[in-house]
Amino acid sequence: MKKLWQNCHIATMQNGQYSYIEDAAIVTEGHLIHWIGKQQQLPADTYSETVDLNGAWVTPGFIDCHTHSVFGGNRSVEFEKRLQGVSYAEIAASGGGIASTVRATREASEEQLLNSALKRIRCMQQDGVTTIEIKSGYGLNYENERKMLRVIRQIGEKLPMTVKSTCLAAHALPPEYKDQSDAYIEHICTEMLPKLHAEGLVDAVDAFCEHLAFSPAQVERVFKTAQSLNLPVKLHAEQLSSLGGSSLAARYHALSADHLEYMTEDDVKAMAASGTVAVLLPGAFYLLRETQYPPIESLIKHGVRIALSSDLNPGTSPALSLRLMLNMGSTLFRLTPEQALAGVTIHAAQALGLEQTHGSLEQGKVADFVAWDIEHPSEIVYWLGGDLPKRVVQHGQEVIF
C-alpha cells in the first residue's frame, strides 16, 4: 500500500549536500521510498493514506554511527575529578575510566542493561535518530561481551530503529589480563570473535589504538581476524596521540576511523585513498576540554567524508542529543550546517556501510525521515537544546512517542 506525504520541502542530502526539492512530496510503499520529487510532478495513483506535512522541511533520519549506549552505572564522579584537574589518562591508570564501567557492566544483568540503554536511546530517537550503532567493549570477556551484544540485538527488536552492533572487545585490558595485552588480543582473536560472530551477534569489529589501550600491531592482529570472518572494521584512532592508527585503518579499508585529533596529513591521504570515513566526536572533545583539533581543512581538501556522532558513553561523552553534536561540530570544528547534516546522514551511513539503503532521501532507499517545523535546514544545527517540533518516520511508519 502506498502512502503519500505531501506539502513539504526536502533536503535529500544526496552527495553530502542539501540537494533541495521545494514544494515536494514523498510516496512510500512499505518500508521504502517509492517516489520523491516536486508535488506538481506527482504521478497519478491511489494512496492508502495522505499525510499533510504542513510545509515542514524533511531530512533523512539521523544516523548516530558511533555510540557506547549499553553500559552499567555512570561516571559522574569522574566528571567532577576531571574538573579538579585530574586527566583522563590518570583516572584510567587508577582503576577508573573504562575499568569502572567494566565492573558495573559485568555486575548488571541483561535486563538491567537493556532497560537503562532503552532510556538513553529513546532520548536519541526523539531527537530524530532512526539508525544507531552500538559497541560492546565494557565486558572484556566472552560472557560479558556476549551479554552486551545480545542486549544490542534486543534493542533492535524493541525499538523502531535500525541498530548495528560492533564488537569492541579490544577496548581496554581487563583486570584478569593485567600486563598481558598480547595474550588478551590472542584470546579475542582465537576465542571471542569467532564465537560471537558464529552466534550472529556482530556486524563490525572495532578497537582502541592508543598508548593506554592497544598498539597498532595488536590492532592489526584483530583486523586480520575480522577480515578472515568477513567482518568490516572500524577504529578509535589518534584521539590522544599520533600512532598511525588511522593509516592502519585505511590499509584495511575500514568503514571509519574515529576521533582523529592527532592524525597527520599522511593519515588523511591514506584515508582519502581507501574511502575510509572520518568520524568526528565533538562531545568527547568538549567534555575532555581538548585543545588539539582534528585537521578539518586537510580532511576536506583531500576529499575525506566527515561524519559526526554522539560517542554516547558514560565517561567522556554522556551525550543524549545528536542535534547538540551538530551544533558542536559547527561551533567547535567549523563545519557548515550543510556539512554537519551530511555528517549525521549520508556520511554516517557510509561509516556503517549502509549508504546504499540509508542516509539520503532517494527512490528505492529506506523511508526513514524527519519532518521539521522550521524555515530552513540550517536551523536544525543552529538551535541549542530544546525539542524542535518534528515528526519522525521510520520505515514508512510515523513513530509515536
UniProtKB/Swiss-Prot annotation:
Ligand binding (Fe(3+)): 66, 68, 236, 311
Keyword presence, Transmembrane helix: no
One Pfam family hit: Amidohydro_1
Residues noted as binding 4-imidazolone-5-propanoate in the record, renumbered to the chain: 75, 138, 171, 239, 316
Main EC class the enzyme belongs to: hydrolase
UniProt entry keywords in alphabetical sequence: Cytoplasm, Histidine metabolism, Hydrolase, Iron, Metal-binding, Zinc
Transmembrane segments: none
EC number: 3.5.2.7
Subcellular location per the Swiss-Prot or TrEMBL entry: Cytoplasm
Names of the cofactor(s): Zn(2+); Fe(3+)
InterPro entries: Amidohydro-rel (IPR006680), HutI (IPR005920), Metal-dep_hydrolase_composite (IPR011059), Metal_Hydrolase (IPR032466)
GO cellular component: cytoplasm
Chain's role: Catalyzes the hydrolytic cleavage of the carbon-nitrogen bond in imidazolone-5-propanoate to yield N-formimidoyl-L-glutamate. It is the third step in the universal histidine degradation pathway.
Name listed for the protein in its UniProt record: Imidazolonepropionase
Protein's organism: Acinetobacter baumannii (strain ATCC 17978 / DSM 105126 / CIP 53.77 / LMG 1025 / NCDC KC755 / 5377)
